[in-house]
Design a protein with these regions (language model features):
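Early extracytoplasmic/lumenal segment of secretory-pathway proteins
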Residues: 35-99
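N-terminal secretory signal peptides
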Residues: 1-9, 23
Length: 359
């Protein structure tokens, strides 16, 4: 999820466009460091941050950010499950926030240290079923999952998961996401079930469908389906909307669609893991990200939907009114949020994916 390739604006050109440079407005206040050393260890999706955000934060605060990358939530969870190796801030998706709360892997946030949350974030994101009261997580970005495709190489718009999961028409030209939730969840949607089904029979149906389709699938991609699409290695890929939007900037033959059977709507968050060595610095960085100008620069660069209303207001219509970034109500009506289903249900999916990959 969330893999950035090319910039649209640098921080300076973005701020110049909004008049902020001329007005002498900075990205954030200079922070007074407390007892913590001026370091922050950030565990994030692949380059899922603004082009200059880390440097800008260092200029504003004196805090040096080191960023490590993970490919999916499973990797994030596994990395921290046996103990925090030293991270201060992580970016779990909504269902994994709930999972990590139950596993006591997150610490409560001090909202008093994050004033930009109430000031700038849209009211719809100021509470969450997966984290009531936003006790453990702050909203970062949100979006959908669907099909990225090369228009000149397919016959029409691939408006059904059938194109990827139940047809040999594009054999050898299809990529699926490798995560168990993504592949099995979309197979469940295609079969008319809930993405969040915990019924072993329904999960087995999804497994059987993908195994049957496997000879026609070129690759189960580790969050790089957009790169395979851009390079011409595949013509259809299961991917996150922002990843496809990024490569659409480089090639106007590429497009994105949410299939008619529906998909998921997800929300990525900012959270502090248990035993974080620099929790105060993590709070400062969260508040910085939720600043209007900083948040706008990040959203414009990575092309995902920001929950930061103040940031969205600063961005042009080709972002703020783009239905591939901010889906229509009709599209959202066909989507459902992924929820934490319990460890037993997660094992069912993980084991099903293991059998799929081994088939």
């Amino acid at each position: 999820m969330r893999n950035r390739r090319v910039a649209r604006y640098s921080r300076r050109s973005f701020l110049a466009g909004t008049g902020a440079v001329a007005a002498g407005v900075s990205f954030g206040p200079k922070f007074t460091l407390a007892a913590e050393e001026a370091k922050l260890n950030f565990y994030n999706w692949d380059t899922y941050i603004g082009e200059t955000t880390l440097d800008d934060f260092k200029d504003a605060s004196g805090i040096d950010v080191t960023m490590d990358l993970f490919a999916d939530n499973d990797e994030l969870f596994a990395k921290l499950k046996e103990g925090n190796p030293g991270y201060d801030l992580i970016v779990p998706t909504n269902d994994f926030v709930e999972r990590m709360i139950k596993a006591e892997m997150l610490v409560p946030l001090d909202h008093g240290k994050i004033p930009n949350f109430k000031k700038n974030v849209a009211k719809a994101f100021q509470d969450a079923e997966f984290d009531p009261g936003r006790k453990y997580s702050m909203p970062y970005m949100w979006g959908t999952q669907g099909i990225g495709y090369r228009k000149s190489r397919v016959d029409g718009v691939p408006d059904s998961w059938k194109w990827l999961l139940d047809s040999d028409k594009y054999a050898g030209r299809i990529a699926l996401l490798a995560g168990s939730s993504a592949a099995i969840g979309m197979a469940l949607k295609y079969l008319g079930h809930s993405y969040n089904s915990v019924d072993p029979k329904e999960i087995k149906q999804a497994e059987d469908l993908i195994i049957k389709q496997k000879p026609h699938i070129k690759v189960f991609a580790e969050d790089n389906g957009q790169d395979l699409l851009l390079s011409g290695e595949v013509d259809l890929t299961m991917e996150w909307n922002g990843d496809i939007l990024q490569v659409m900037e480089e090639d106007d033959d590429l497009a994105y669609v949410v299939p008619k059977e529906g998909s998921i709507v997800w929300q990525d968050t900012l959270a502090i893991p248990t035993d974080a060595p620099h929790p105060d610095n993590a709070h400062k960085f969260i508040n910085y990200i939720l600043d209007a100008e900083a948040g706008a620069a990040i959203a414009d660069f990575i092309q995902y939907a920001t929950p930061n209303a103040a940031a969205r207001a600063l961005l042009p219509d080709d972002y703020s009114k783009n239905s591939a970034i901010f889906p229509t109500d009709e599209t959202l009506s066909r989507c459902e949020p992924e929820v934490y289903k319990g460890e037993a249900a997660q094992r069912l999916r993980d084991e099903a994916l293991t059998r799929i990959l081994a088939a």
